[in-house]
Amino acid sequence: MEPLYFFISFEPSHLFTRINAGVLLDFIYGRKGTLLNCNADSVASAVALGAAEIAPTDLVFCFEKAGVLRNPDDDTSLIREITAATYPPLKADGVVSKGMIPKIENALKAVEKGVRSVTIRSSENLSNGIGTVIRNS
């Protein structure tokens, strides 16, 4: 396994062009040019934190469901809001599990450190307000 390095090299103009377009792809390469696995939510959260130092920032995570669901098989079981106080019981009860855990934990860290809100929603719901909003308590 290739060791991880914490040095990032990038072309700033490429990053700003993508941010201004509202899209950020997270292709991460190792020292030898090999493509590495990277959590896109972690990258998006880090970029949002940087943006929050400059201007009020809201972050949206898009995926295939309308948001965080109490029952993954029931699209009407949407949880409208999650905070640092309401998250632990959801995790303990298994309502939040698997890949949703890092998504919500990244969102909670982002709002704790200055991002106004993080919304988890389907790309089909970008303009209609449907989704789960993660807020600071």
Language model features: what each stretch is:
Residues 1-137:
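C-terminal catalytic "cap/lid" subdomain
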